[in-house]
Structure formats: C-alpha cells, structure tokens
C-alpha cells in the first residue's frame, strides 16, 4: 500500500456521515436513509465484490447552460439504456427543473479550492452527471485531501408505488432493462440514494483506493449484513479530464456516536444504551478480526454510526427510556427555539488520525486546553492536574436520567479557558463542556490546508457543504422493534490485514494502544484497547486518556503517564520491547520525562469518585474494561471474550 493513508472520514458536522463522517443526519458507509434498508441485496446486478468496470463519461464544459432544455427531452428517453455512449453528454437524467450547476469550488476556506483540479487531482463533477451508468449526482456532500463525496440517486434502484393499489406505500425494486427502471410496473416516485466517493487520480491515491476496495470486498464476501459492519455497494473507475479515478459507492446511514455523546451533553449515556452500542461494536470487531482477518486501526465514536438519521441539535427534545428508546420529549417543545439559539449552528471540528504531531493527532471529539494554558504548564504529571480539575466536575451518574444530569462546581481554571468561539452558547453550556473544548493552535490545519500540506503519512480531513442537512429526513424515533438503536462500524479506509500492515502510525490519539505508541508488535488487540476507551467515553462523556503536552514532555509521554496512573507500571514488553520504548522509558521502566508517578488513581476509584457510579456499577464496569486494557496484547481480551462477558448478558439477543 502507498504511504498515503486512505480517506479518513470521521469529521462531524450536523449528523450525516461519510464512511464514518457525520453531516446533517445522513451517512456514508452504512445502510439506511429515512428508514429504507438496502440490506445485503446485490443492487442492479452489481455484485458487492464484483469486478471493476470502467465508465468513461466526460464531464461537460461549464458553459452548457443553454444545452439543458435540449438535453432534458433526449435524456428522458435514454435513462439507464444499456446502449448509452459513455462519452456522450446525454448519459445523465435531467429531471424537470433540475440544474446542471457546476460544483467547481472557489479558492477559499469553504471548499477544497481549484488548484488540485488538474492531472492527478480531483475530478470535476456537475449536478446530474451519471457515473457507472447508474449513479446520478444530486449534490455535494464533502471533500478531503484524497477525494470528494457526492450524494447520488441510484437509477437502477427506483422507489415505486404499486400499480395495482392506490396505497401510498412505496417499495424499492431493482430495475429491469426498461428505460424507466420500474420493473414492477409501478410509478417511480424516487430513487435510492447513495454516497459516491471519487478518489483523486494520481497513482499514490489510486493504490490506496485499491487497498481499501480489497478490504471492503473481503468484508462483503462473508455476508456482513448482520455483523454490524458497513458494506461497499459498488466500485468502478471513471476516466475524466484529469485521469482515471477510483469510485466507491456506499450506503447511507445516520449520526455517529459522537453526536450521541453530544446529545447527552458529555455527561455519559444510560448504561443500558452503552451496553447495546458496545455489543454491536464488538460483534463487528469479532467479525472482521476472526472471519475477515482485518484490523480496523481507528475505532472511535466517530466511526460507529447509527442506522437512522436523528436530529441531535435540539438535545432536550429527545430523551431516553429503556422501554421506549428515544422519544420526543413534548414538555420541552416550548423551549426549542431558545435551545437552538444556545447551540452552535455548526459544531465544526477537525480530524487528525495517524498523525503523530503533538498538535494534530487528536480525535476531533477531543477538546484540550488553550494554547496559553499549555504554555504555563510545568513538568509535572498531567493526570494529577486532570484529577484536580475533574473532581470538581462531580457528575451524578443516573441510569435513566443521564441526559438531564447537572454538572456542578466547575473549577475556576476550567472557566478561565473557554473557547473563544463559544459566544453562541450560554455560560452553563460552556461550563458543562469545558473539558471537551479546544482552541485550535496555529499549527492545526484546516481541510483546505491539508489538501496542500499533508504529507504521505497523513490522513484525510473532510469538510462539508453548508446547507446539506435540510435535504435529509429527520426521524423522530431512534430505535428498532426492540427499542434499541442499531449501529454499524464504518470507515475501513485505514484498516489493514492481520498479516500485512501498511503503516505503524495507527489509531487516533485518545484511543491509541500502548504498543502503538512505543512502536512494538501489534495486531487485532489494538482495536480492543480502543473499544475499551470508547466504552468509557460513552458511559462518562469523557476520554479515558486525554494526554496533553507541556514544558519538557510531549503528548505521548503524558499518554503513557496516564496509563501508568490508571493501570500501574507496564511490563518489559512496553518499556523495552518497542522500537521507540527507549524514547519514553529508562532501562528500569520509569518514564524519562515524567518520573514522578507515585500517585495512583485506579479505574474503580475514577468511576466512583469522579463519575459517581454506584459501587456495584463501578465493579461491573471495571471488570468489563480491565481485561480490554491489559498491557500485553496476547493477554488482552478478544472481541469474543468481551461478547461473552457478564456485563453484556442483559443486552437483547436480537443483536446476535
């Protein structure tokens, strides 16, 4: 595989996801839009693991405004015609009133810019362009360093009304070879929508895309439909003016788990919900580890998506009930307008996985202290600083009321470091989320900057088009027939094989395993470590490990210090067995740059003292997490071990 990492689409904006990235309530990398499931059926005769085909549709000139009327009549007679000339402009369907508007970007911070629309770069896309003879462009979803992503209608999968009934119920059918694509004879009222990722055409990007497709095909090969893993629907190549581009088609999903964390105002979810989501995540990990022989390498809340779209930006409008799942809280409707005004219009953040730079390797769900505070920190153990600050947080843990818990006694240090961009939030919201906010440093790159400065060891940040979210249906329910939300693991762009690693720079900072930090031998257990970190975050709203750099030490030093404080001194495998162990440890196993680690704060104490878990809750949760946090990868619990743990015994069996 090329040194360039594949698209990491984990940036959240509004709730729609692109292979793990959220925007406006719809998602790429999973299964459903508005509750319509694609299931495991092969679409339009295209096998999920089928061979690559080539489309040679050439995009139109941007000066084609006057051709629209002429094309409309012609194209309506040629929809999905197998004899279409791929080089003809008429290989697209123009609905009445549609626009052939160019999506070429401007040179500003709101899009990817025009400089990389050249040989080896992005492919120019226009509304109503058709790719692979079936995917018609509707709108732009987002972009990153490696690719652009587009919302498309799948013209081979129309949604029809029954011709024998006046019922308004719609059915999704694979089209026959007739021109209208309505094989059942009903009236076509729409088309299944998918997300199309078009990769830049340079060889390095193409090689990375080939690796990703192989991994995604392996997942689809073993019938992943019930394994809580998102699947690739289709892939092909397209030749345009800038070269040959790999194109990947994904299903549409809902919000990611980071949105759910935000919905609960970073105070933790009901433990029953945490168990449900973790069981599905572990089902997915067990499947890819044991059956597919794949390591995800970037498990985090942003990369687990719900199957239904959900509007989390009016947080108090929806509350959790074990009996009913999420339902509309009618008593809060009078406060809806004020709540919306208090929420930021867009909680845009940045994703920097696999980047070992201290300024940019954080998950975008992480918010650290301001740059000024970091400059004032001395060479002392940051975990003690975190403890002093966070003990004042005094979160009351209640299984059924965690979405309305109050946070008291925020320390003055925390309130002095408010995000400068939080003017739209009220003071209480700022205090509640202070430990999650980060003022970007001057070295943090935007998506536009990444497109020009990211090296071959970087990964992709996605930015999203404003105003897309209104197009997607918002469901008022987030549960299935058993009242529990369904979720899927997404974003295999950084995955690798168990016997073939593409890079050792893996995992987002907060979820990174110790063996990955010291560059020791690693495998599937790195995903289990990340799963433990994610479970803690879902239950508490905070990261289990939130390292910071300071005077005389880097984030990796602090990260290891936090692990030692929680789990004790690491074994020789960690302090001496990695290629970079000596960078962080002495020959005796002490940290070089943070030697004073006399205090311990074990997990049970963290749960009871800081998050106010009951004694029994803390014991049970600790018993589940600690085997997943074993320093030694070979002794760490497997996904199957975790699924068999008593902590998950009360999760509904339908998830199996």
Curated annotation (Swiss-Prot):
Biased segments, Gly residues type: 16-48
Binding site for ATP: 141-149, 197
Biased composition (Polar residues): 96-108
Swiss-Prot/TrEMBL catalytic activity: L-seryl-[protein] + ATP = O-phospho-L-seryl-[protein] + ADP + H(+); L-threonyl-[protein] + ATP = O-phospho-L-threonyl-[protein] + ADP + H(+)
Signal peptide: none
Protein's UniProt name: Probable serine/threonine-protein kinase sky1
Transmembrane segments: none
Compositionally biased spans, kind Basic and acidic residues: 383-401, 413-440
Family: Belongs to the protein kinase superfamily. CMGC Ser/Thr protein kinase family.
GO biological process per UniProt: regulation of mRNA processing; spliceosomal complex assembly
Molecular function GO terms recorded: ATP binding; protein serine kinase activity; protein serine/threonine kinase activity
Keywords, comma-separated and alphabetical: ATP-binding, Kinase, Nucleotide-binding, Serine/threonine-protein kinase, Transferase
Any single GO CC term annotated in Swiss-Prot or TrEMBL for this entry: nucleus
Region of interest called Disordered, as start-end residue ranges on this chain: 1-127, 157-185, 330-454
PANTHER family (alphabetical): PROTEIN KINASE DOMAIN-CONTAINING PROTEIN-RELATED (PTHR47634:SF9)
Low complexity biased stretches: 49-64, 72-89, 160-179, 332-355, 441-454
Gene this chain is encoded by: sky1
Domain of life: Eukaryota
InterPro entries with a match to the protein in the record: Kinase-like_dom_sf (IPR011009), Prot_kinase_dom (IPR000719), Ser/Thr_kinase_AS (IPR008271), SRPK (IPR051334)
Residue span(s) of domain Protein kinase: 135-648
Catalytic residues of the enzyme: 298 (proton acceptor)
EC annotation from Swiss-Prot or TrEMBL: 2.7.11.1
